[in-house]
């Protein structure tokens, strides 16, 4: 049985985090001889994945069970067309973590809507995704923004060009 993975991608804006992750998502949805195809869901807080079909937050459970394997995204808008607030993004992430399973979740720009002191229940939900057969990738602008609990649970880290000095954080890498 496969073990779900928790990954982090770190780098400043415009260095290819989303581009590289999109290529990975294509492989994920396509599958291989070793791995069956799996669906992908993006929490698109910046509305930047315009080439990917959107779904409503209320349809996440249906998407999770649908036989068609594809990439979909949650746009940063309420059903009435107003932009989601920072609290709405946090609530949306809870909803996704509760209902989406058997795929890959990309949490884009997580520091935009979650403060330096992430709620413990949200971090716990992200870190205990194994029971949902859910792989998670989180995009961060800075390596220093990854919380200790997330560091402890990471399976992998992809590092892009960054303005942070890694020397400040090198002790975090000792077991990675």
Q: Model-found features: residue ranges?
A:
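Conserved P-loop NTPase motor cores
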Residues: 7-26, 83-175
């Amino acid at each position: 049985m496969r073990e779900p993975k928790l990954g982090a991608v770190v780098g400043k804006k415009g260095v290819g985090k989303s581009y590289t992750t999109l290529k990975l998502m294509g492989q994920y949805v396509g599958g291989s001889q070793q791995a069956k195809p799996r669906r992908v869901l993006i929490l698109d807080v910046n509305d930047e994945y315009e080439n990917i079909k959107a779904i409503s937050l209320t349809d996440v459970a249906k998407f999770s069970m649908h036989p068609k394997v594809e990439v979909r995204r949650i746009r940063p808008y309420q059903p009435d067309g107003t932009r989601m607030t920072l609290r709405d993004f946090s609530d949306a992430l809870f909803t996704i973590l509760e209902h989406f399973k058997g795929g890959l979740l990309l949490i884009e720009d997580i520091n935009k809507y979650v403060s330096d002191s992430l709620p413990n229940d949200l971090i716990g939900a992200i870190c205990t995704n194994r029971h949902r057969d859910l792989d998670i990738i989180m995009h961060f602008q800075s390596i220093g923004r990854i919380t200790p609990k997330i560091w402890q649970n990471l399976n992998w880290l992809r590092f892009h060009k960054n303005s942070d000095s890694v020397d400040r954080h090198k002790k975090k890498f000792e077991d990675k």
